[in-house]
Amino acid sequence: MSRLYAIILIALVLNVIMTIMPDSKVEAVSCEDCPEHCSTQKARAKCDNDKCVCESV
């Protein structure tokens, strides 16, 4: 029975990790789409070396 609890616990931890990870990933967004992309994150759009960077407001 303890194996079942361990498997459920591991599944829950993996679920939380998968939920958090995409937020920390840098997305390749062109400068044209940058303002629209950053507005969904409530951040200010900025272009660095032709890459979109969202700065916290």
Swiss-Prot record:
GO terms for molecular function: potassium channel inhibitor activity; toxin activity. It is found in: Secreted. GO terms for biological process: envenomation resulting in negative regulation of voltage-gated potassium channel activity in another organism. Expressed by the venom gland. Disulfide bonds join 31-47, 34-52, 38-54. One of its GO terms (cellular component) is extracellular region. Its main location: secreted. The keyword Transcription regulation does not apply. InterPro entries: Scorpion_toxin-like_sf, Toxin_alpha-KTx_8/9. Residues 1-28 form the signal peptide. It comes from the Eukaryota. Keywords: Disulfide bond, Ion channel impairing toxin, Potassium channel impairing toxin, Secreted, Signal, Toxin, Voltage-gated potassium channel impairing toxin. Negative results: does not affect Kv1.1/KCNA1, Kv1.3/KCNA3, Kv1.4/KCNA4, Kv1.5/KCNA5 and Shaker IR. Belongs to the short scorpion toxin superfamily. Potassium channel inhibitor family. Alpha-KTx 08 subfamily. This is Potassium channel toxin alpha-KTx 8.5.
